[in-house]
Amino acid sequence: MIIFLDPHCVEYSSAGHPERPERIIRAVPLLKERHPTWEWRQPRAANDAELLRAHSRKHIEFIAKTAEDFDLDTPAHPNIDKYSRKSAGAAIEAARAALGGERAFSLMRPPGHHATRNRAMGFCYFSNIAIATLDALENGANRVAIWDFDAHHGNGTEEIVARNPNIAFASIHQSPAYPGTGLTSFANIDNYPVAPGMPRSEHVDVAERALQKLLQFKPDLLLVSAGFDAYSGDPLVQMTLEQEDFASLGEWLCKIDIPTAAVLEGGYSDELPELIDAFLTAWDPSS
């Protein structure tokens, strides 16, 4: 397993904001202690050409220059352009590592799956997973599948990749919940809205059905928007998954013979480090 991490990604914060540095700070020592053989790499920043595959130049410039918050959830932190480019770069590098035969996980912030082509929102500035997907298609992959099991709909990813015949996207998310999208499926987009409080077993079944549908696409690469906010103890939604359920998601990845990389999205409970570890350990049980 290769973990992509830039330690500077913990340098920004807002008082009381759930997308806080501790999400990473507490996960790093736990993973390093339990998995001493895993490789840790610092990512590079995504460049303009890579960002422009998913975003308009106006959006890229706005992220770099604005001093006003993008919305109530998405502050204009000092240097957020720098941190967001590193997070996008980590997703790109993780996808490329997967195409090279490695298992790879981007342990970075900010997350990305709510960022649309022209808008930062929902704690997200650049669409990391979409940027990585489009980069992969430019660098050897012919078909890429995206499996998003974050508790919130990946609306930004959907907007950017919709109707691209070389991409299949599936999102399993609570509904109703932020951002209020993802109710219908179309073209290359499969949405799986689940009700608040859905029994664990039913939620897991939906996630597996979504993954199996993606595998029918016969992708050269599977990218995972790994959000851990469907956990029963997460403060932002009302879902029911437990630690062992995230292990099940990882076990499924372990069993498929497709290059795979995952990117951290949400997850705001104090148990996030344990949830990440359960998922990664099941995905790479030899470590």
Residue ranges and their predicted role:
Residues 43, 149, 264:
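Small/polar loops that bind or transfer phosphate-bearing groups
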Residues 37-39, 168, 259:
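Conserved beta-strand segments of alpha/beta enzyme cores
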Residues 14, 92, 96, 106-255, ...:
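Conserved alpha-helical scaffold segments that buttress catalytic/binding sites
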Residues 1-133, 142, 193:
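Metal-dependent C-N hydrolase catalytic cores
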Residues 56-62, 242-243, 272-287:
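Short, electropositive alpha-helical surface patch
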